[in-house]
Structures are given as structure tokens and as C-alpha cells.
Amino acid sequence: MPNTKPVATAEYDAVIATVQNYIEGLRGGSNPTIAKAFNKDATMYGFAPDGILLGGPISNLYRYVDEFGSAPEIKTRVDVLAITPSTAVVRVDMEGDGAGVDYTDFHTLLKFEGKWEIIAKVFHAYE
């Protein structure tokens, strides 16, 4: 059995760069920048600070950014939890979005035609 590394370090960097588009879009309140990270058919689900389950198409995120604006002081930590040649799971811990809310996100990414895209975002928002 060959002892080969299936995923190059550069792929981790590419995954993080994709997620960084999401973060920088939040920081600047820029939906076009956020959209660089997400597949057009991406979905998102999660719990709001009041415990209500929210979900649906990624356009809900764009509406949220339109409503609450930029997050110039946002703090984040990004961890690639798992990666294969075509899939990845990333955790984003963030403090201080445009509404002042703290979150933990889990993003599932697929590599489409050589480009990483987030296809699903699940989140937990804290009070």
C-alpha cells in the first residue's frame, strides 16, 4: 500500500481563502465578496440567539448583511476540521458580526471544477 499524501497543503490554504471571502464580506458588509465563497445553491440552517431555528437558501445571509451592515471589528478563528481531495469541513468561530452577535459556523465545501465553494452553512448564534 503506497504511503502517499492525498491532500496537498495548498488545498488547505485554498479552503481557508474561500472561507476568508465570507469573513471579509461580513467585515465590509459586502454581499458580492461573501458570494465569492458560496455556491449559488448553498443553504444555511442554525439557531438564532433566541433559540429559534432559521434556515433556507444562502440569500437569507445576504438579506441579513443588507439589514445589519458591516462588522469592522469582527474577530474570527478558522479551523479546517477535515479535508479530502474534493470535500472539506471548516469551523469558523466569530465574535461581533454586524448585529453584534457571536457565532460558531460549520461550513461544508465541495471542490467544483478546481474551485472550492461552500455548499452548506450551519450555525449557532449566542446571546
Language-model features: where?
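Short, low-complexity N-terminal intrinsically disordered segments enriched in polar/charged residues
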Residues: M1-P32, K36-K40
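Residue-level recognition of short loop/turn positions
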Residues: D41, D50, E113-K115
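Surface-exposed, charged secondary-structure patches
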Residues: E11-A14, T43-D50, L54-D102
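Short beta-strand segments enriched in hydrophobic/aromatic residues
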Residues: F38, M94-G96, V122-F123
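Residue-level signal for short amphipathic helical patches enriched in basic/charged
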Residues: G29, D97, E113
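Short beta-strand edge/turn micro-motifs at domain boundaries
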Residues: D102-E127
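Terminal "cap-and-tail" regions of soluble proteins that handle hydrophobic small molecules
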Residues: P2, G56, K115
